[in-house]
Amino acid sequence: MTSSCSLSRPQHLFFFFFLFVPFLSLGQQISVDINSAIWEFPSNPLCLSQQSNFAKSSQFSKNLDSLVSSIPSLKSNTYNFYSLSVGSISDQERVEAIGICNRVVNRVDCLNCIAQAAVNLTTMYCPQHRGAYVRATKCMFRYSDKPIFGKLETSPVLEAPNPSNATGDRNEFIRLQSELLNRLRSMAASGGSKRKYAQGTDPGSPPYTTFFGAVQCTPDLSEKDCNDCLSYGFSNATKGRVGIRWFCPSCNFQIESDLRFFLLDSEYEPDPKPGNDKVKIIIATVCSVIGFAIIAVFLYFFMTRNRRTAKQRHEGKDLEELMIKDAQLLQLDFDTIRLATNDFSRDNQLGEGGFGAVYKGVLDYGEEIAVKRLSMKSGQGDNEFINEVSLVAKLQHRNLVRLLGFCLQGEERILIYEFFKNTSLDHYIFDSNRRMILDWETRYRIISGVARGLLYLHEDSRFKIVHRDMKASNVLLDDAMNPKIADFGMAKLFDTDQTSQTRFTSKVAGTYGYMAPEYAMSGEFSVKTDVFSFGVLVLEIIKGKKNNWSPEEDSSLFLLSYVWKSWREGEVLNIVDPSLVETIGVSDEIMKCIHIGLLCVQENAESRPTMASVVVMLNANSFTLPRPSQPAFYSGDGESLSRDKNQINHIASLNDVTITEFDAR
């Protein structure tokens, strides 16, 4: 502690006494005090008018009282969903009830909220009604004398739209919001019988950069009923507002344009393990006494070392707290991820790189995820982990993959991404059969999307970033084959006004074949490093071959040299994938992309265009392109290329392998 916060010795004794006294309560059952919790409830009763009243002396009244009074003693669960009943199924006086909380509410608060909602509903809002429904800010409770488990109910409706109308293109605003909600609807509906919930973000419509959405159904519903309920809500809710919350008994949703009004998903604490309460109390008491004695004996040493330990705590700030505070991401425990990936089964493995393996996972409520488990042997686990969490979580663009969450437990470093069943571009473009799926329209869309994503990283995001590992395997494809740039483990952050400048590193990491010569040889990197990698990728997409490919007639030429030689000799057909030539020939658009690719892979970094120029060139119908100079590592007779290759053959083989730290020459 600093001098301004120091305590005298008597104060220390009282401080530590009161610090340890609370441990006496360890192991005791958590009591639910419905009077101490403060929740916001609607002032108007939501009694179901079609259901008649009951007499206070009736069996239904007794059953309802029994049900309500039992809620505080329920064992809380991590799913925040409770279904209760009193009375036999054939009994006309049977009461059925459902309580559910928002996903962001912790389980103890959830039970508090439902308990108070039940009391308010039966004593204040709808006394003696045989059916009623109430929605608080964090929970919902409903009961009925009719069967309600697994039954879709869309009435009554509560709607809370933001009073502000959207500005900009209203139709585009509504369309993009609908796309996000419909995507989340499918995810939530496919959840299990314990949770039907999904949340996510999508790029917004200017001037709104991001849309934040969350949808939820009571998990007793079938997949069809959940879909129908949310579809009904989407159709009937007020359109064109900057934010809205919509509720009915069976489902609810929220969509916002401002993160300040959107609660991110929280992680739940595990259920307490069963044990002997008396033993726990005895152990806690003994520990408290021993702890108090130790503190009293060594108080002097604590006080003298106080300033130093405070500094150490500050410098060694817990990485987990840093990730949660800075990134505001969903954090999952290791056991949840191990279950989702079938204990990291090889059948679930999607790929493997220099930093670890990627697995497909399915969470217990049905959401598919991609799990990147960083290798503890890579030597860069923490560095890559911090890079991806701190950078990617704050980036929002339709052509960048979204980081959903993370796990930090012991030595485990795990990143959780949105899952794409189409996997990555390299699975298509380098496969002779799958490549046929990629017509020119799709390939051009991929080229343009990657260009826009890199432009966002270099110039348009709040953080200016050089990716440093742009390649086909780091371009994921969504259901519509739109590209998403992935893997930011080696990305570097620049100051806003420094993206045009050059930096140096003594530890070069990346994939040979995509590396710019100045980066591979001397560790020099800038935005032009990514431009070079993009140019290689463009030529791979057009030719349908890896950058280490050689023609049968001349094994000394690799892709860049072959393209340059064919371009200079006017043999453009040699540069284009035969499947494209058969369908559309060599169009002006293909010629333009070849030209842009060659401009990007020029040996001189200053001659390469910026990504802003690339995007302009791709979108322009008539644009005079500058003449490209020869690409890096080119030699017509192959000698220069061989010499350059031998000079850096310690980096990696010509295979598409990401390599980690090595000293640049």
From Swiss-Prot:
Residues annotated as glycosylated: N120, N165, N236
Catalyses which reaction(s): L-seryl-[protein] + ATP = O-phospho-L-seryl-[protein] + ADP + H(+); L-threonyl-[protein] + ATP = O-phospho-L-threonyl-[protein] + ADP + H(+)
Protein kinase domain span: 344-624
Chief place of localization: membrane
Cytoplasmic-facing ranges: 302-665
Record topological domains on the Extracellular side: 28-280
Catalytic machinery residues: D469
Gene Ontology CC terms: membrane
Binding site for ATP: L350, G351, E352, G353, G354, F355, G356, A357, V358, K372
Chain positions found as Phosphoserine: S473
Signal peptide bounds: 1-27
SMART domains attached to this UniProt entry: S_TKc
A GO MF label: ATP binding
Subcellular location: Membrane
Modified residues (Phosphotyrosine): Y417, Y519
Protein name: Cysteine-rich receptor-like protein kinase 41
